[in-house]
């Protein structure tokens, strides 16, 4: 099903665990193999460690992949924009509660039946949304939280506070189960939007009656620093991308004004016998010269920003960022007769790609 990242190796001994690097990129998920019900049951997670001291709540991170398009296709294609915007200091995201049949969540349930799915939420992140500080806390404090990536058209990052799990690019289908008391920090979103399904796993009546110990969660200061550095880097990339789009809008307006003034000057020259006001012509020409200077400056600044973004964006993410910039340029409001101006002045040929 995946692998488990142990966080308390002395207390919670497990066999053959994989470790996670501080900054990890996961390749495109491979096609999942079909397994029998019995095999699938054996591969399920176990969130309780049975020891001589009794049942102990595990402090581990469980990472796997899910066929989300098959299981949650309706949630991915849902166009209802009924999310609630949360826009606070250092935190911006959209969230709404959803009802998900338990059968669709079978792969994140434990094999011992100690936890059950309670509340489910969809979290949507648009370009520049995310957490620069803090985390999202949902669910029972003695339970677990499953974070499932349903859709990602941009570059999503995720950090489980206090652990070594800092992911710089979450792929569709990626699933991370962690202690609810840790929370989940979504790093600033770059480019297109992403949708995550958050599932709260609460202790069942059976586990509560049996009793269990809740150990103190561990902490990884190095990962915390790495997450903060990565978050700041992503904020810089977002700011530069926004600047590129802004420069493009300013260029269109400058080209448009230049075109209009040039036509007006041509009109004045064509009717020189009637329009003899030389001061007017001089003023128009000065304005045209100023605009051309501004255009040159904008083009130079654009080249600098593109070079800067290329140095910050991972090579694997270049196409994603390029597609987002192109889409935003096409969708942003432009000047009057925009298409005509852009085409006639070859503005569409300007290289805004990284």
Curated annotation (Swiss-Prot):
Keyword set, alphabetical order = Late protein
Q: Induced by what?
A: Expressed in the late phase of the viral replicative cycle.
> InterPro entries given for it?
Poxvirus_F11
Q: What does this protein do?
A: Stimulates increases in peripheral microtubule dynamics and may increase the motility of the infected cells, contributing to cell-to-cell spread of the virus. Seems to inhibit the signaling via the GTPase RHOA and DIAPH1/mDia.
| Family statement drawn from the similarity comment of this UniProt entry | Belongs to the orthopoxvirus OPG055 family.
- Which protein are we looking at? Protein OPG055
Native species: Monkeypox virus
């Amino acid at each position: 099903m995946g692998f488990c990242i142990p966080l308390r190796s002395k207390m919670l001994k497990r066999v053959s665990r994989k470790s996670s690097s501080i900054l990890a990129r996961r390749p495109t998920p491979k096609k999942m193999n079909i397994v029998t019900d019995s095999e699938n049951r054996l591969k399920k997670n176990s969130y309780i460690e049975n020891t001589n001291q009794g049942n102990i709540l595990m402090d581990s991170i469980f990472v796997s992949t899910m066929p989300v398009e098959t299981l949650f296709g309706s949630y991915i294609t849902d166009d209802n924009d009924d999310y609630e915007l949360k826009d606070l200091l250092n935190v911006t995201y959209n969230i709404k509660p959803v009802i998900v049949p338990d059968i669709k969540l079978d792969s994140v349930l434990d094999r011992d039946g100690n936890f059950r799915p309670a509340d489910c939420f969809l979290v949507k992140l648009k370009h520049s949304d995310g957490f620069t500080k803090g985390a999202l806390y949902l669910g029972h404090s003695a339970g677990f939280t499953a974070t499932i990536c349903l859709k990602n058209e941009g570059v999503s990052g995720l950090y489980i506070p206090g652990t070594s799990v800092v992911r710089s690019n979450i792929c569709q289908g990626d699933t991370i189960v962690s202690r609810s008391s840790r929370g989940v920090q979504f790093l600033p979103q770059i480019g297109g939007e992403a949708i995550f399904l958050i599932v709260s796993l609460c202790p069942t009546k059976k586990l509560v009656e049996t009793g269990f110990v809740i150990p103190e969660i561990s902490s990884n200061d190095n990962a915390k620093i790495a997450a903060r550095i990565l978050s700041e880097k992503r904020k810089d990339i977002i700011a530069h991308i926004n600047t590129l789009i802004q420069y493009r809008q300013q260029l269109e307006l400058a080209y448009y004004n230049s075109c209009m003034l040039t036509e007006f000057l041509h009109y004045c020259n064509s009717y020189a016998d009637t329009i003899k006001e030389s001061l007017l012509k001089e003023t128009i020409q000065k304005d045209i010269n100023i605009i051309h200077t501004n255009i040159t400056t904008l083009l130079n600044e654009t080249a600098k920003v593109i070079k800067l973004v290329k140095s910050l964006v991972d090579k694997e993410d270049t196409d994603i960022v390029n597609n987002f910039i192109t889409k935003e340029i096409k969708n942003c409001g432009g000047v009057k007769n925009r298409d005509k101006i852009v085409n006639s002045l070859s503005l569409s040929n300007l290289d805004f790609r990284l």
